[in-house]
Amino acid sequence: MKTKILIILLLCSSTSLFACDICGCFMGITPYDNQSSFGVLYRYRSYHGYNGQSQQIFPPYSSFSPVKGKNNFPPSSHNGLYSDYEVYRTTELRGRYFLQKRLELNLIVPYLNNSENYNLQNTTIGGLGDINIFAGYHLLRKLDKKIINQRLIGGLGLKLPTGNNQAKSKQGLTYVNPFQAGTGSTDGFVYLNYIIGFKNFGASLNSSYKFNGNNKRQESIANSSTQFLNVFYKIDINEKLKVIPSIQTSYEFTKGEKYKGLETGVHETNNVLTGFGLDIFVKNIGISSSIQTNTWSVKTDHPRSSGRVTLGLTYNLNQLYYAIN
């Protein structure tokens, strides 16, 4: 019974998150067992420090929280200054509805606030991002076993070009595609989420692959993949309060920007992040948090991935009926 409860709790935690912030693919919060849910997730991602330089997850003079838009400066080149950074902040409204016990529909509406600082020139743009719609099917659902419980979810979805992709500097120059609130392209993605629990211990493995289209300027981002591994332990404070600490690691890969189908090498992402997570459950409410820092990244001429922070709040409904039996 404890193992079953552990799997159910994990399904509503942010510990099943997997992400690629540059390419716009970010999955989870996964829901309470067959219960519809809604919530808000704030995620912060930073890139700081060229090859050979130290890194900070919160670069000097940057902000963890959203800041006022400022587009006084045109896109700038990279000259290796330690003060250079890119910061991506996203606030997401998330909803999930179970049509049937094994079939779920998901909606993510993001609002972006992106900042970059190059050559001592700081720019921030923001706005509604690209909306994600996706469906997941619970291929394996064994939650009533005495020793080991498992769940496997497979899904697919679309990222719609709802975000502005035309932001320009005061000089009339268009900012690069990944820095925009939207990519201007319709993209598709597939994912798998496997969770296993043994008594109070458990692990979650997530994998996603994203097929990126072109926008009107024939810009795109190369197809991307993300893998996320999370090992966790459930602590029962009392009947109403559960706490799940976790150790997390993720691997992200994309060859970066493309123009007219050709790879430019700009914003190439090939890195490993590791860190910790903490999820707290009080009745139907889930509070999630995580922090990851750079463990390894490929050599590029851009600031390297330095870290990620997420904060989430989810309410899980007491769903008794389904549209499809």
List each model region and its residues.
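Transmembrane beta-barrel strands of outer-membrane/channel proteins
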Residues: 38-44, 107-111, 154-160, 205-209, ...
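Residues that define the transmembrane beta-barrel architecture of outer-membrane proteins
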Residues: 34, 87-91, 125-131, 150, ...
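Detector for outer-membrane/organellar transmembrane beta-barrel domains
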Residues: 34-49, 177-259
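Residue-level signature of outer-membrane beta-barrel architecture
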Residues: 42-44, 97, 109, 137-139, ...
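A subset of solvent-exposed loop/turn segments in beta-rich extracellular surface proteins, enriched
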Residues: 23-133, 141, 145, 259-260
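Short loop/turn motifs that connect adjacent beta-strands in outer-membrane beta-barrel proteins
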Residues: 26-35, 51, 102, 141-151, ...
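Outer-membrane pore/translocation modules
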Residues: 113-220
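Outer membrane beta-barrel transmembrane domains
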Residues: 51, 59-78, 218-325
